[in-house]
Amino acid sequence: MRFFHSRTCPPLPGKLWSRQPRRNGATNMSEHQLDHRAGVIAAVVPCYRERASILDVLEKIGAEVSHIIVVDDACPDGTGEWVRSECADPRLTVVTHTANQGVGGATLSGYTKAIELGADIIVKLDGDGQMNPEMISRLVRPILEGRADYAKGNRFFRLQGISGMPKMRLVGNVILSFASKVSSGYWKIFDPTNGFTAIHVKVAKILPLDQIDKSFFFESDMLYHLNVNRAVVADVPIDAIYGDETSHLKISRILLPFAWKHLNNLVNRLIINYLFRDFSFASVQLLVGMVLIAFGTIFGGINWYESVSTGIVAVTGVIVLAALTFSFGAILLLGFLNHDIQNQPQRPLYPDL
């Protein structure tokens, strides 16, 4: 990859590309004002075929952001070069990939560059215009106030905010949200695929960035890695913006890969959190419950098959044994599930790092 810094360029056609009003805090500080001394904020904007919208997005990024990092993920339309030639913002840095790495790979490259630039908080927003840069102040506030290590947008807080969401996308988000709750352990977090996120740099540094998924599963995989590191995640209400942009995410292509990745993360999370990091009564509930359910299912299934094959009704004791072991195992797993829901990280990591 290559790094470019912006040069002084002509303003956008028909628009005054001026940062002065925003640096005076009159426009983009939204309804909340941030203490700039609290942290240096870098905004990472991954791009792939977003030449039509990227400049409008960059123009709306306010003075609370010290660095703007545009990552050209080998765009066939040369988005990075376009931004470099048209944007005169002195905060701009362009990172160019020679090969496409996916939205996760582009975001991680932006993280790396933001760390090099000395950022304290890294915000990620897409270049398609669906995320309002004027909400950056709201997004980073839980981190600046020491209430969270990672903050993410949630489009489902306000029902009127999702009225414009396409129906298939709405259904898909509900399904993916539940799957992410199970696999990541953040049971109170919703809208996991939302790409409007912020993370404290100290937390980003302890994550295995080279192991995080680089595809569209990136946001969900981030939640898994944050949980096994016991990071606090906050949901921030945001409004979604839907236009005529084309989504690169195809449900038919991600259904099975996402299901497998969620299952893999679930198994790894349970092993790490309940066997390696801690072994408690909840661990016993999990292990014994799984064994009893497996025994009840297999034992009952074998005897049911023999009964059907031979025409001889299984004895009452066999039926009761299979039912009791399965039921007791289910009770234990429900107890474990209740513990897991309550076991979300509560104390932010970064103040102690």
Regions found by a protein language model. Name each.
Residues D72-E81, A99, G129:
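A conserved acidic beta->alpha catalytic loop
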Residues L58, S66-C75, V95-T96:
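Short beta-strand/loop segment that forms part of the nucleotide-sugar
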Residues R2-F3, N24-H36, I212-D213, F217-L353:
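Hydrophobic helical membrane-anchoring modules
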Residues Y48-E64:
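Short, well-formed alpha-helical segments that are part of the catalytic scaffolds
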Residues A52-D56, D77-E86:
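Acidic helix N-cap motif at the loop->helix transition within catalytic regions
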Residues V95-E116, I121, P133-F216, G243-R253:
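Acceptor/aglycone-binding surface of glycosyltransferases and processive sugar-polymer synthases
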Residues V40-A42, H67, D221:
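Cell-envelope/extracellular polymer assembly enzymes that use nucleotide-activated donors
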